[in-house]
A protein has these predicted regions:
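Short, Lys/Arg-rich flexible segments
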Residues: 1-84, 90-94, 98-143
Length: 143
């Protein structure tokens, strides 16, 4: 799965530190809220580039779009919470890995120009994702 790393603003990190013992129960909710925003932006960007500006008619089956997903928020051995948003490890009906299709669209190949959709999803969705995460966090801090 593709890896996206975002640095969080200092005021957001201060709010997180106020949670104390509740942090481990709130962190997955906060990460999933931000992940949903990025996933939505990825779907939008992917739909806008698949089959556009090609020499031949598109033969898209929708397998790549269907493989987009989000892992549950999990804590690693260092105690850090992570969530992954992107293309899964599955293959289409012909055995072609969807990650390969995503890479070819993102970076292009000989005779096929790049159509970046993943990187732009991260940059376009970043502010919305952080706002969504803040909203969930504030909802958890108030009660």
């Amino acid at each position: 799965m593709a890896k996206v790393t975002m640095k969080l603003p200092d005021d957001f990190l201060k709010d997180l530190s106020r949670l104390g013992d509740k942090f481990d129960s709130v962190a997955p909710k906060v990460l999933e809220a931000g992940g949903k925003v990025i996933l939505s932006q990825m779907r939008t960007n992917l739909a806008s580039v698949v089959g556009k500006d090609t020499k031949y008619e598109s033969r898209s089956t929708g397998d790549l779009e269907n493989s987009l997903g989000m892992t549950p928020a999990l804590q690693d051995r260092n105690g850090e919470w992570n969530i992954r948003v992107g293309v899964g490890d599955d293959k289409d009906s012909k055995g072609v890995p969807n990650a390969l299709k995503a890479q070819l669209l993102e970076y292009g190949k000989s005779g096929q120009p790049a159509k970046p959709w993943m990187k732009s999803a991260r940059s376009k969705g970043r502010k919305k994702a952080i706002a969504s995460m803040k909203q969930v966090l504030e909802g958890e801090l108030l009660p």
